[in-house]
């Protein structure tokens, strides 16, 4: 795959950088949540970190044939203060992607007829909507000094779709069967 338009390529690199940082940040915050006796919130962070990894990999793969050094600039929350603040940082990051970043990237890819970029931006946007809700639910529980009450978290390995529904049969975003999902 190769991207013909510089703007879409820049957006893919930016999204790759942002998703890569979210992946690492969520792994760190997941460990901290577990160490603070919030194992389910920790597991949620780790599951969503896997989803962010999938998004980064999808963006990377669209640019796979465009090999060269590039500076990647992406906004990110840094630091770690406490569970409530970490969850707020996660919520803010997801909302930024939902309301600002991915809608612009997606429309640009459509306009420039970059089908693979359009697909990967769509996958990420749809998953981020779920992530924001799950992080909000986790924060609501943590504000009451409670761990979130969840079972397994399932992640689609193709698009990063995230669900708590153990009865789902296939991914509603990309169609992959649930038996391929990663469970956390």
From Swiss-Prot:
EC numbers listed for it are 1.11.1.1
Pfam families, sorted:
Rubrerythrin, RUBY_RBDX
Tell me, what is one Gene Ontology molecular-function annotation carried by this entry? NADH peroxidase activity
Q: Where does this protein hold Fe(3+) 1?
A: 19, 52, 97, 128
EC supergroup of this enzyme: oxidoreductase
**Which keywords are on file for this protein?**
Electron transport, Iron, Metal-binding, NAD, Oxidoreductase, Peroxidase, Transport
* Binding positions (Fe(3+) 2): 52, 94, 128, 131
Against InterPro entries, the record matches this protein to: Ferritin-like, Ferritin-like_diiron, Ferritin-like_SF, Rbr2/Nigerythrin, Rr_diiron-bd_dom, Rubredoxin-like_dom, RUBY_RBDX
Q: Which residues bind Fe(3+) 3?
A: 156, 159, 171, 174
Q: Which cofactor does it need?
A: Fe(3+)
| Residue span, Ferritin-like diiron domain | 2-146
What reaction(s) does this enzyme catalyze?
H2O2 + NADH + H(+) = NAD(+) + 2 H2O
Q: Could you name the domain of life of the organism this protein comes from?
A: Bacteria
Record-annotated Rubredoxin-like domain positions: 151-184
**Is Cell division one of the keywords UniProt gives this record?**
no
Kindly state what the record says about how the cofactor is bound: Binds 3 Fe(3+) ions per subunit.
What SUPFAM superfamilies does UniProt report for this protein, alphabetically? Ferritin-like, Rubredoxin-like
**What's known about how it's activated or inhibited?**
Rubredoxin (Rd) increases the NADH consumption rate by serving as an intermediary electron-transfer shuttle between NROR and Rbr2.
Entry's induction text: Various environmental stress conditions, e.g. oxidative stress (exposure to H(2)O(2)) and other stress factors such as salt, increased pH, high concentration of solvents or cold shock, do not lead to increased transcript levels of this gene. However, PubMed:15336429 shows that rbr2 is slightly up-regulated after exposure to air, but PubMed:19648241 shows it does not respond to the presence of O(2). Is not repressed by PerR.
PANTHER family, per database record? RUBRERYTHRIN
Q: Could you tell me what this protein does?
A: Functions as the terminal component of an NADH peroxidase (NADH:H(2)O(2) oxidoreductase) when using NADH:rubredoxin oxidoreductase (NROR) as the electron transport intermediary from NADH to Rbr2.
In Swiss-Prot or TrEMBL terms, this protein is called: Rubrerythrin-2
State the encoding gene: rbr2
């Amino acid at each position: 795959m190769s991207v013909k338009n510089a703007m879409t390529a820049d957006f893919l690199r930016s999204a790759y950088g942002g998703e890569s940082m979210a992946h690492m940040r969520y792994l760190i915050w997941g460990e901290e949540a577990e160490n603070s006796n919030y194992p389910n919130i920790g597991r949620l962070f780790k599951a969503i970190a896997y989803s962010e990894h999938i998004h980064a990999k999808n963006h990377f793969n669209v640019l796979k044939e465009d090999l060269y050094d590039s500076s990647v600039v992406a906004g990110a929350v840094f630091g770690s203060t406490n569970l409530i603040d970490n969850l707020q940082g996660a919520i803010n990051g997801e909302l930024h992607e939902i309301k600002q970043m991915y809608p612009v990237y997606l429309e640009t890819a459509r306009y420039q007829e970059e089908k693979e970029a359009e697909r990967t931006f769509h996958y990420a946007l749809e998953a981020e909507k779920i992530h924001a809700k799950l992080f909000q639910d986790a924060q609501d529980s943590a504000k009451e000094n409670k761990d979130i009450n969840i079972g397994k978290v399932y992640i689609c390995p193709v698009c990063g779709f995230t669900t708590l529904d153990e009865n789902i049969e296939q991914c509603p975003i990309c169609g992959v069967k649930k038996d391929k999902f990663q469970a956390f």
